[in-house]
A protein has these predicted regions:
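Acidic two-metal-ion nuclease catalytic site recognized across multiple nuclease folds
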Residues: 1-4, 164-186
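Short, glycine/acidic-enriched loop or turn micro-motifs at the edges of active sites
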Residues: 16-18, 126, 160
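Hydrophobic/aromatic-lined pockets within catalytic cores
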Residues: 108, 132, 144, 163-173
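Acidic, divalent-metal-coordinating active-site segment for phosphoryl/phosphodiester hydrolysis
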Residues: 153-166
Length: 186
């Protein structure tokens, strides 16, 4: 299926030093600009955040301080990113809540005014959440391969919830432990 575009749609993703918008920094940006004629233009850049990347964050995205030590700072490439995104609508995964606000804040931090008015935003995660149930019945089907009958009956719901937890413990033994203190902190 082809997308119907009246102007470019920029799919983009950021890797950062953390989740704090206005406090953390971008270490990688990737953009796929889809033009109305179907042409695809790629932009990718690793960036020196000029602050340390916490080890726990490096373990998530695989980018270390050493890998970006000689890369340009965001300030040095903000202008080219601004021009690449000019006249684009945006798309991403959880982009409306993280990537777009983070990028706009970084642009403002380095003195680049980036206008969002008139742009359209496509968040693939929002589409996923609206079209794929994220309720007890869906979790029961996913983890237990059973259909939940009598949903919203308290007895059926607690039984299903218990079975889901047991299935999660079986499915994710490397990441979760059958210990209430651990599960509480998870």
């Amino acid at each position: 299926m082809e997308l119907s575009l009246s102007r470019p749609l920029a799919f983009f993703d950021l890797e950062t030093t953390g989740l704090k918008i206005g406090g953390d920094r971008i270490v990688e940006i990737a953009i796929l600009k889809l033009l109305p004629n179907g042409e695809k233009i790629h932009y990718h850049r690793r960036l020196n955040p000029e602050i340390p990347i916490p080890e726990a964050i490096s373990k998530i995205h695989g980018i270390t301080n050493e890998m970006v030590a000689n890369e340009p700072s965001f300030d040095e490439v903000a202008g080219e990113i601004f021009l690449f995104l000019e006249n684009c609508d945006f798309a991403g995964y959880n982009s409306n809540y993280f990537d777009i606000p983070f990028l706009v804040e970084e642009l403002l931090r380095v003195g680049v005014e980036f206008e969002l008015d008139g742009r359209r935003f496509v968040d693939v995660q929002a589409i996923f959440h609206k079209n794929e149930p994220r309720d007890l019945k869906a979790a029961y089907r996913f983890y237990c391969q059973k259909e939940l009958t009598n949903a919203h009956s308290a007895v059926a719901d607690i039984t299903a919830t218990y079975e889901i937890l047991l299935s999660q413990l079986d499915r994710y033994p490397e990441t979760i432990k059958p210990d209430v203190d651990f599960l509480h902190r998870y």
